[in-house]
Amino acid sequence: MHNSKEFYESVTNNIIDFYNKNNRLPWVRPWSNSNSGFNISFTTKKEYQGINQIILMMSPYESNKWNTFNNWKNLGFHLKKKSKGTPICYFQMNKVVDKKTDEESFYPMLKKYYVYNAEQIENNSTLIDKPKPKNKILPIDEIDSYVKNTNAKIVEHVTNEAFYRPFTDSIHISNINQFKSSYDYYATLLHELTHWTMHESRCNRKSSNRFKSVGYAYEELIAEIGSTFLCNQFKMDSASHTNLQNHVNYISSWLQALKDDPKFIFKAAAESQKAVNFLNSFQQIVKAA
């Protein structure tokens, strides 16, 4: 448990330090990246989940391919000298048996392990994607279909704002032509779609309606991270998502919450991942139909 506490505090302090040094949060990248998308395990091709995505977003590497030391070695690759691993985690369920009643119970225990980026590999030309011309046209149909499959109620209007209204269970957003780019429109829509999952019939998240309250800021953080995960899923550059820079009202609340509770970002990332998984489940249902 002591090691778990240290890991929570280490990740939290790294995020705070990252913000202080870069004046941005780790999931906001002010540049385009030819290797954009979710950070993945090079061996399994699976995406890292929740807090692990955020930890890997803080790395200085552009490649989104990662592996453990042994997995790189088994594939015939060698690390560059003095390469340092990036610590990430998983939760292992431990069993406890009550000596009096013989009843079994389980509790999650955090386990830490290290991964290395493809850019830390010697002779890595086969691992690094070549820069591609940036597409000016977003695959709009793909995201439109994704949103439509959720059956979320979308209301377009001409005001310069976007929000999810709980009591009507509807998403309100400006017309796409009012945005600077289609990227900004869809990133904003995905942000509000993450809010939409808070409804009691979906992920059932409780949130305060008071602007700038801790509960309100926490829900905004969940939607912020959820939108980023979805942008990565659709391989959209966060550099194009100007909405990510519009949360200065919440940053002080987030930083204070991080300082007060080392598990705060872990909880938010877990809720964001749960929301994304919920939204993705609609796509699986449609494909199976």
Label for each model-derived stretch:
Residues M1-A289:
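N-terminal accessory/interface modules of nucleic-acid-binding and processing proteins
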